[in-house]
Amino acid sequence: MQGKKPGGSSGGGRSGELQGDEAQRNKKKKKKVSCFSNIKIFLVSECALMLAQGTVGAYLVSVLTTLERRFNLQSADVGVIASSFEIGNLALILFVSYFGARGHRPRLIGCGGIVMALGALLSALPEFLTHQYKYEAGEIRWGAEGRDVCAANGSGGDEGPDPDLICRNRTATNMMYLLLIGAQVLLGIGATPVQPLGVSYIDDHVRRKDSSLYIGILFTMLVFGPACGFILGSFCTKIYVDAVFIDTSNLDITPDDPRWIGAWWGGFLLCGALLFFSSLLMFGFPQSLPPHSEPAMESEQAMLSEREYERPKPSNGVLRHPLEPDSSASCFQQLRVIPKVTKHLLSNPVFTCIILAACMEIAVVAGFAAFLGKYLEQQFNLTTSSANQLLGMTAIPCACLGIFLGGLLVKKLSLSALGAIRMAMLVNLVSTACYVSFLFLGCDTGPVAGVTVPYGNSTAPGSALDPYSPCNNNCECQTDSFTPVCGADGITYLSACFAGCNSTNLTGCACLTTVPAENATVVPGKCPSPGCQEAFLTFLCVMCICSLIGAMAQTPSVIILIRTVSPELKSYALGVLFLLLRLLGFIPPPLIFGAGIDSTCLFWSTFCGEQGACVLYDNVVYRYLYVSIAIALKSFAFILYTTTWQCLRKNYKRYIKNHEGGLSTSEFFASTLTLDNLGRDPVPANQTHRTKFIYNLEDHEWCENMESVL
């Protein structure tokens, strides 16, 4: 018996060692995955991906004018490119939001990021498939210093590429245009799961009072991305487009030259790499966070009546959709639910109005910001790189700060739905006033020979306007590019050739008839407009204020939306939001703004006998039309905010009171009323609780199961 004890002891020791090893392995495994079991780590990862998404989106906007000149496109054409991202996103947003809410959300987000990375890489592909850029193409009269001068004295010779060859490359250019559209569609498809699934995942795992701050940080990072995108665009456009193929030391043009084309493709390669690596982090997160990392037990349940929310939220944080079909249901039966649930959501006027208001606000951003760089170039005579740099360092950081402050105010002031909608109305009014001031901040086109004033006689009737004049008829001037020069007479000419200059040092310009012959010289660039510099500085300051205040409405709008729908429908409701944002807020505005801008064109370039890009605009009409469209959209958004406010006031069912602290006079408006109580009786001074408002329509209670929907 005693002989067996050592063996038994040895076996027990081995068993204990095995158990100890297993416990140690489990401990290591737990420690290994613990870093991905924290909602704050997920927030950082989601912010990194949204930063990369915002960067690539803004980078496209920053190089639109470069693409316009590189591929000889019109503003409406580049508007189509800008809208293609939304078309791709629009195609799948509902399906991803509906089915993705029940799937592995972090992994779906990661897959979307990889698809976006592929789209970014494809966006750069046209540069490597088309011919090299020849800035002297079609302008065979350029002198030794690259200046378009009069060919009457034979100084230009017949050197240069065959114009027929350039025109034959037109078909290839059209193919590159289609490839750019396809790449943007792919980017939109990849972006589909990032925002709706990311926002719902975060909102499911944080306390309700912290949700606005987390969402505000998330959207702040999304808007901070464009700042990086514009700065990246400013850097890339200073590099010559074919710098990797040729020796740039032999170039006789600089980034300040109107013929300069920057390396627009470089930023897409960098953005593709950022998207890919930031997407990899998402594959480490679980489908739902463990209970100890998820302090959201009070998140949505406290906001709803027992009748609406009978089933408690699972401890793992995964919301089970009351409309979710059984696992045995066919795919077709599941798809049948989508239009019915969508109709059910849209029957809620608060939900519909707040989404439409958000669409109008986004429409201003999508349309106005898409052409803001072009606007700065035309109105204030800036270069593409300078315009991008200013946008990236001023307006966009202010918008980031505005979104963050909006979320912070909602959290600190404990705003309810009524308070949030009043906050949105207030910031809308202030930002609209800023847009009105833009009508008076700009520069005139100035006198342009043959376009706005006749040659040598600024008082002749408009019927005499023609860029070709007896002074340059023998110069064989071309209109396939725009290289403006400022004459000693204070008039801008389309090029040195149109000014009749017969020397590459820009002297002896025959069309400058109002000055002595020895002073008949020109200098590169447009003639400056008086007071333009002061107007630009004022515009920049007002733009920063407008961006800061206008962006503060974004987080309150999202909070109103997710607080006025059933929690089981939260992911899908966000999907409907982003669907309508794409359908109404992102796709039409660039097309509308682009077509409106083209309508103000004074002079079009020609390419192979066809109309090319606009090279000169009526700045006054441009400014009035461009800003007026934005003001109209902002005004419509205010009407929708007001309608939402009225619905919230008149159709509420009940109030939920808690003790999170009241909102006093000194804490916000320095009045005796709070945002939540404007329009109602003042809250007594000794009242320490606030009123939470939940909106439910009498005839539109939320369905409890699939059968009630079907």
UniProtKB/Swiss-Prot annotation:
Query: Which pairs of Cys residues are joined through disulfide bonds in the record?
Result: 471-501, 477-497, 486-511
Known glycosylation sites: 153, 169, 381, 457, 502, 505, 519
Q: Which organism is it from?
A: Homo sapiens
Q: State what induces this protein.
A: Transcriptionally up-regulated by SP1 and RELA in response to FGF19.
On this chain, the residues bearing N-acetylmethionine are 1
Per UniProt, what is the name of the gene that codes for the protein in this document? SLCO3A1
Q: Which GO terms describe its cellular component?
A: apical plasma membrane; basal plasma membrane; basolateral plasma membrane; plasma membrane
Keywords (A to Z) from UniProt: Acetylation, Cell membrane, Disulfide bond, Glycoprotein, Ion transport, Membrane, Transmembrane, Transmembrane helix, Transport
Which protein is depicted? Answer: Solute carrier organic anion transporter family member 3A1
What are the recorded GO MF terms, alphabetically? organic anion transmembrane transporter activity; prostaglandin transmembrane transporter activity; sodium-independent organic anion transmembrane transporter activity
The taxonomic lineage of its organism, from the top, reads: Eukaryota, Metazoa, Chordata, Craniata, Vertebrata
